[in-house]
Design a protein with these regions (language model features):
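Sec-dependent signal peptide recognition
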Residues: 2-9
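Compact, glycine-rich, soluble single-domain proteins
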Residues: 17-175
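Residue-level signal for mature regions of secreted extracellular proteins and peptides
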Residues: 9-10, 163
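C-terminal motif of bacterial Sec signal peptides marking the signal peptidase cleavage site
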Residues: 13-15
Length: 175
């Protein structure tokens, strides 16, 4: 009986410490987050970004916290559906960010340049917005992006590309 118990214990230990299965070995280590194209049309040209989307309240709460870097053409979009007055802070955010608060017509309502890492001071446009876009700090100034410039994303930003998303933002042309 002791021999049988010892074999069972040994078998359980071997099973728990075995190497990953073939399926585990073939799975990607960590899939990169899916991105969404965004185009900003400014007086200085058209600028494309491929950004992550914070859809859920949990994703929006975390945002770009703990990131050590952000690509020049990267960022994060925080869609607000329905539009609402959004307030952001930089708690646990390691890098400066530009925050672009976007009107429902696609124009930039407010641009906070180079928001200070770790700051707990709220940043807001003070009005309901359709989205907030966070870019690498200083990027808006580098590209001449300013309040009043227009954004579109998803299939409306790059209509010639096949985009599988339900997040298409197609503002009406400026009058």
């Amino acid at each position: 009986m002791n021999r049988l118990a010892a074999l069972l214990v040994f078998g359980l230990i071997a099973a728990c410490s075995s190497s990953p299965s073939a399926a585990d070995k073939d799975a990607p280590a960590r899939a990169a987050p899916a991105t969404l194209p965004i185009v900003i049309r400014s007086a200085k040209g058209t600028h494309r970004f491929d950004v992550e989307v914070a859809r859920t309240p949990q994703e929006q709460e975390k945002g770009l916290m703990f990131r050590k870097e952000l690509a020049a053409d990267g960022g994060m979009l925080f869609p607000m559906n329905p539009p609402r007055t959004a307030s952001f802070w930089m708690k646990d955010t390691l890098i400066p960010l530009d925050m672009l608060f976007v009107h429902t017509d696609g124009t930039i309502a407010f641009l906070q340049a180079n928001a200070q890492p770790y700051s707990r001071v709220p940043v807001s446009a003070g009005i309901p917005v359709a989205a907030v876009l966070e870019l690498r700090g200083g990027r808006a100034a580098e590209l001449g992006i300013a309040e009043g410039d227009r954004l579109a994303w998803g299939g409306c930003a790059v209509s010639q590309e096949k985009i599988a998303t339900d997040l298409n933002f197609c503002p009406s042309p400026a009058n």
